Amino acid sequence: MTTVVAIQGPGWVVMAADSQSTYWDSRKVLMSNGKVINNNGVLIGGAGQGRGLDLLQRGWVAPKPPKRVKTVDQLDDWMSKIFIPAMRDHFVEQGYDMKPDDSFAKHESAFVIAVNNTLYLLDEDYSYDR
């Protein structure tokens, strides 16, 4: 089981995670890739299937976060309209997000995302909470 911890304060965010992975047969291994990464100014902590975070770590550059936002609603707009669609496009291109036509988009990971000192929890259906 993965543990990702994130704390948001006034003008700062800190995030940490364990470094163990468990295979389906219960063997435990120490991971070579971290569960918390910095991708183009976006801090991403991942849990669930390791493939999702691997894809965000290798071969993908996150959209650059906006430098100045006046309201958190503007940051929510960036998450909804820029970051999440770019992430999903990468997952689809790499075969990680595959769905039948009559189903909703889904992956098998959960992410904690820190951008501009604001934390988001991104669920497997691409919905988020702040």
Where are the regions a protein language model picked out?
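Conserved phosphate-donor
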Residues: P100-D123
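Conserved short S/T/G-enriched processing/targeting/catalytic segments and their helical context
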Residues: M1-A105, S127-R130
